[in-house]
């Protein structure tokens, strides 16, 4: 089956400098899921090289089935950018781009760009509805992460 493409983007503002935001965001740890209020999820981090890692995220659904997503993360410090490409899971081969930029007064923002592949929906209407829903969910997680970042870096 050919997947449908779901594209969306949003901006999340941070009350910390671009460099601090970038370092905080790319410091992947096993307890990251708790920061996003993902109670039924775990994360394992495998460092491949200094700026390359694989995330093994496991989510337990309502039927108590485990869904594992393996993500290849490539970090570009000079650009304050990183990518996350799904290697396995329900959104296999989806890719997400994260770009941190400086704002005035020592603040910054993240531009989140998603190209998500949906193997379940085949109708344009379903894809548009799902795009809005996943964008809202991802934006909510980044809002939580922004709050945690402020607590952690102040």
Predicted regions and their residues:
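Hydrophobic ligand-binding cavity/cleft-lining segments
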Residues: 1-50
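Short, surface-exposed coil-to-beta transition loops
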Residues: 7-9, 55, 64-69, 91-97
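A short, structured loop/turn motif at beta-sheet edges
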Residues: 15-19, 48, 73-78, 99-109
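Hydrophobic pocket/interface hotspot
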Residues: 21-25, 72, 82, 110-112
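Glycine-rich portal/gate segments that line the openings of hydrophobic small-molecule binding cavities
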Residues: 29-30, 41-87, 145-154
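Beta-strand/loop substructures that line and gate deep hydrophobic ligand-binding cavities in soluble
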Residues: 85-140
């Amino acid at each position: 089956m050919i997947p449908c493409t779901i594209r969306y983007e949003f901006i999340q503002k941070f009350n910390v400098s671009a460099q601090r935001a970038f370092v905080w965001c790319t410091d992947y740890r096993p307890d990251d899921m708790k920061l996003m209020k993902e109670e039924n999820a775990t994360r394992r981090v495998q460092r491949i090289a200094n700026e390359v890692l694989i995330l093994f995220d496991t989510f337990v659904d309502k039927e108590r089935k485990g869904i594992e997503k393996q993500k290849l993360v490539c970090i570009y410090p000079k650009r304050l950018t990183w990518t996350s490409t799904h290697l396995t899971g329900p959104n296999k081969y989806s890719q997400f781009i994260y770009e941190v930029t400086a704002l005035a007064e020592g603040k910054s923002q993240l531009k989140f760009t998603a190209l998500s592949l949906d193997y379940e929906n085949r109708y344009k209407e379903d894809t548009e509805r799902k795009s809005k829903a996943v964008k809202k969910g991802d934006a909510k997680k980044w809002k939580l992460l922004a709050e945690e970042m402020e607590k952690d870096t102040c």
